[in-house]
Amino acid sequence: MAKKRIYEVAKEVGVDNKVVVQKAKDLGFDVKNHMSSIDDSQVAKLKSSFQNSAPAEKKAEKSATKNNKIKISVSSIRKNEKKPEENNTPKKSNRRRNNKRRSSDRARDNKERDAKSNTGRPKAAALLQQFKQKQRAEEGQLNREAQKAKKEYHEHLKHPKKEQSEKDNKKTVKESNNKKVEQQVEKKVIGPKILKPSPARLKKNQPADNKEKVTTPRVTIPEAPKEEKRGNGRGRNMGKPGRKGKNQFVNGHSERSDRSERKRRKNKKHQQEQQKPRKQITKRKERPLPDILVYEEGMNAQDIGKLIHREPAEIVKKLFMLGVMTNQNQSLDKDTIELLAAEYGIDAKQKVHEDISDIDTLYDKRMEASKKSKNQIKRPPVVTIMGHVDHGKTTLLDRLRHTHVSAHEAGGITQRIGAYQVRLDDRLITFLDTPGHAAFSNMRARGAEITDIVVLVVAADDGVMPQTVEAIDHAKSANVPIIVAINKMDKPGANPQHVTEELMKYNLIPEDYGGDTIFVNISAKTGQNVDDLLQMILLQADVMELKANPDEMAIGTVIEARLSRGRGPVADVLIQQGTLNIGDPIVVGDTFGRVRTMTNDRGRQVKKATPSEPVEITGLNDVPESADKLVEFKDEKTARSVGEARAQQSLQKSRENVQHVTLDNLFDTMKKENMKEVDIVLKADVQGSVEALQQSLEKIEVEGVRVNIIHSGVGAINESDVTLAGASNAFIIGFNVRPTATAKSQAETDGVDIRLYSIIYKAIDDVTAAMKGMLEPTYEEKVIGNLTVRETWKVSKVGTIAGSFVDKGIVKNDSKIRVIRDGIVKYDGEIASLKRFKDDVKEVKQGNDCGLTIKDYNDIKVGDEFEVYEMQQVEPK
């Protein structure tokens, strides 16, 4: 079946597409728009529905025709006419022909439409034809009247120089005719009125083929010709026919001046419209003046205006009335600002700038604020183990942590602060292990300052010793409670009663004797009463009600610091308040940076550290000093500025400490210049060891000789240290560090003496003996070979076997060996066994592989370096 589209049906019935689409949808057809297709049966139903509603549609069409009548004034007709000079042939006949042609076209179109729409309804078609004939007769009458009025108007234009009386008479006639025409047309015409269209638009709207339907015009004759707007260069002024390029002046003004005047009026109106909302914005209430003006010297009028809620112009005016000539951006001094505040009746108060570079003060303020905070929670106690050397402090801590730290310490003594955490019944206790040697007095003092409880370890078979007394003094000066642990109760010569009596001399009275000091008899070796000691520590912590606020920015204290070859500056810190996270910007002493990594005491990486937790951090720009304060800042920019300012202040202080010669110190200076000096370059593994060794060496008193530390630092001995020592005729002391290969080669070439130590008091004794000239012939170590670990195997009952390659020299089975990792000496001992291809050998030369074990040491990793040496006797020089 042939199908038709909706728009084709709409064209046949003469109805708009939208109406046909809606009608089709009402009939239940599946259509979407005017492009939808329907079959012949649906077309018949659709046309039949429109035929049934034809009378109503015709009525609507009639009303639409009336509403679309166009009102054309005589002035617009005048505009469309050409000049008599240019066109001598009048267009009246043409207009009549056009009107007749339009009427005939309309009649033909109406007949065709009636023939299509009124099929099957002859009565309705006859009535409609009769109505249209009547309408055409009325339109013809109106056209004739309009042509008559137009003719009279042209007669008026041909004789413009007649007397005024004739003009008035014609004017009266035209007005009366105009009114009659208007009265007749207004009865018929209802619709929009278009007055004074431009000639171009009127020409454009005229039909070229004279086939368009033209409605009855509405003719209006004006009382007097008025000035018309220019259009396409054909102007009419004062009702006279104009000519292009002429009659440019009207009433003494040019058209260009009129155009400029209109443009000026338009711009002025636009400016007024823009200024209206601006006036509404400025209308605002003045805010009340503040009671106090907190100002800074150097503020300008704009800054003050923001603080006191006034416009800067008002402030400038006020200052001008006070005799001060200024502008909005000019800085004002203190007196001027106070004078202005007094004029407004405001109290002026100068802002006090806080020195953010003083992190010690900032540390104290945050500590006090945390104590007053409502968000405090319980924190683990920080316990420092103190006492004399070799009284069992580290052994006790090993018992608590189930480790063996003391077995790997040089000389069996602790030479750095160690921080550890122990868990007991779901509660944590942080322990600090301090050195007991006399050289580490500052370390013990720092340990007492950052701790909550001091555990004083005293050997039951040795009693109170000098460092025991020093530890008591440190604890009392820090106002820290003391718990006495009498150790080595497993020994036959243990006498705890004697120890108690000695401690009572220092006002440490046991609870059994009516005092407030807790005494616990323990044995770190066997574990006797160690749990009782922990219970006493927790009991003391509960009494003290230790709390902290973890929601604040972190503050803490550096326990120890060192320089790692692979990681850079490393600091062991104890967090005291707040929480430290990875990425936080911090200032530590004179250094700054952002936390890169954090490692706990078990060697595990952590992302945050809470109060009372010791961690090892990296990311600082330099190695800080021990006991430096750690303060967290909001952004890295502030931390950098504070750190750089503190470094600059430290440099200035060091320069100020240089003593210049005066009359008062002239004799002392001359006496010192005559003294002999022992220049030393000091390098150690951690900052605390550097401080302890430096202070111990400077305290050596030998008449006529003194120690001069020209340089000290942490890390391995490098080329710059050797160069400095060679230029200063000094020797190098290395404590728990080794020289690099290039530094060692350069030292041999330059003849620089490098002394390496792992026990601090041996270094002190050697320097003292050298200063006194009493250095006896000693044994000197001679390195005979270097090895690199390439593989490791763990064998039960044997230990760790290190598969190594001899890089240099020779390895003997009775030689001593030193384990070096990242330039740090990890262990110094003896070779237990040496094998090659599963056979025991006495020696292995350079370029060969071998397997060896180290006596009492199994912590060997791939990449470790072995330094094999022998002790050779050196005759005194």
From Swiss-Prot:
Residues 48-289 are annotated as: Disordered. One of its GO terms (molecular function) is GTPase activity. Residues 487-490 are annotated as: G4. PROSITE patterns: G_TR_2, IF2. Residues 412-416 are annotated as: G2. Gene3D superfamilies: 1.10.10.2480, P-loop containing nucleotide triphosphate hydrolases (3.40.50.300), Translation factors (2.40.30.10), Translation initiation factor IF- 2, domain 3 (3.40.50.10050). Residues 123-132 have a biased composition (Low complexity). Keywords: Cytoplasm, GTP-binding, Initiation factor, Nucleotide-binding, Protein biosynthesis. It comes from the Bacteria. Residues 433-436 are annotated as: G3. The keyword Nucleotide-binding applies. Residues 78-89, 102-116, 135-155, 162-189 have a biased composition (Basic and acidic residues). Residues 523-525 are annotated as: G5. Residues 92-101, 277-286 have a biased composition (Basic residues). It is found in: Cytoplasm. GTP binds at residues 387-394, 433-437, 487-490. GO terms for cellular component: cytosol. One of the essential components for the initiation of protein synthesis. Protects formylmethionyl-tRNA from spontaneous hydrolysis and promotes its binding to the 30S ribosomal subunits. Also involved in the hydrolysis of GTP during the formation of the 70S ribosomal complex. This is Translation initiation factor IF-2. It comes from Lactobacillus acidophilus (strain ATCC 700396 / NCK56 / N2 / NCFM).
